[in-house]
Swiss-Prot record:
GO terms for cellular component: ribonucleoprotein complex; ribosome. Keywords: Ribonucleoprotein, Ribosomal protein, RNA-binding, rRNA-binding. This is Large ribosomal subunit protein bL9. GO terms for molecular function: rRNA binding; structural constituent of ribosome. Belongs to the bacterial ribosomal protein bL9 family. One of its GO terms (biological process) is translation. It comes from Mycoplasma pneumoniae (strain ATCC 29342 / M129 / Subtype 1) (Mycoplasmoides pneumoniae). It comes from the Bacteria.
Amino acid sequence: MKVILKQDVSNLGKRFDVVDVKDGYAIHFLFPKKLAAPLTKKSLQDRDLFLKKQQEHYEINKALSHKLKEVIEQTELHFSLKEHNGRPYGSIITKQIINQAHTKGMALQKFMFKDNVRLGFGDHEITLHIFEDTTAVLKVKVTPDNGVK
């Protein structure tokens, strides 16, 4: 019996795969647990429609990620920290970078950063993982605060 998998099933296939299984396995295991549906014209059309929409979403996200990469690489964020005896008092963290990026119109998320970032004085380049194979380098400059002590 040919069925379309509704979920990933170990040793059988992934979601939306068309597989051939024994009748008893399909009737007594896959169908009651809603892991698969019988292969019909309608289920095949639904599968094709879903896969087409999924591909469209993928293409849109890929295009948006390339636009975001261009914006990120053209932007430099500036921060200032208080200093004590020439050393930074505190550090710049991921959350502060994300907040300032949002004010400049960049939609950064915490998962884009490889590690938690803690920056002291100087020029820094942070590699961001935006989408599958798309990475961007964000430039951050941290300077001493020139305010009155």
